[in-house]
Amino acid sequence: MPIAHFTRRYRLSASHRLHAPSLNDQQNRDTYGKCNNPYGHGHNYFVEVTVAGPIDPETGFVVDMPKLDALAKRELIDRFDAQHMNADPVFNGDFVPSTENLGIEVERVFRRAVPLLDPTCQLRLHRIRIEETKNNSFDLLAPGQIDALIPHEQHALQPIA
């Protein structure tokens, strides 16, 4: 049976301050610029969750959408919408609440929960995409998906000056 991908898009508004405790104040300002504002700043995020699995012959669907929406509400919207991300236990410490790190946390939660949405446990998380601005978006492929992108031969990369 072919594997199909289904993507659902969610919206949330949240604020954060990018500040690494391992850097001094000047290094933080140099690294994060206006994103290091002591009061934080906000974004209207769009989060795409892509799942992969067989199409159910009875329903014609890859995923039970109300179950996926309930998971997103509980683990994404209720947790981060209208919140200051620095107050979240995951980001309350050395883990800077960048959009990339938000993606890592969302991927971690959904990777464990998505298979439970399917009684046959054939459904898998494929990708998390977070759009931070109209110009910036971040994709995280779930483990197993990224292996196909890693070349078997390692090439030496030169740093960009």
Mark where each language-model region is.
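Charge-rich, low-complexity N-terminal segments
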Residues: M1-A161
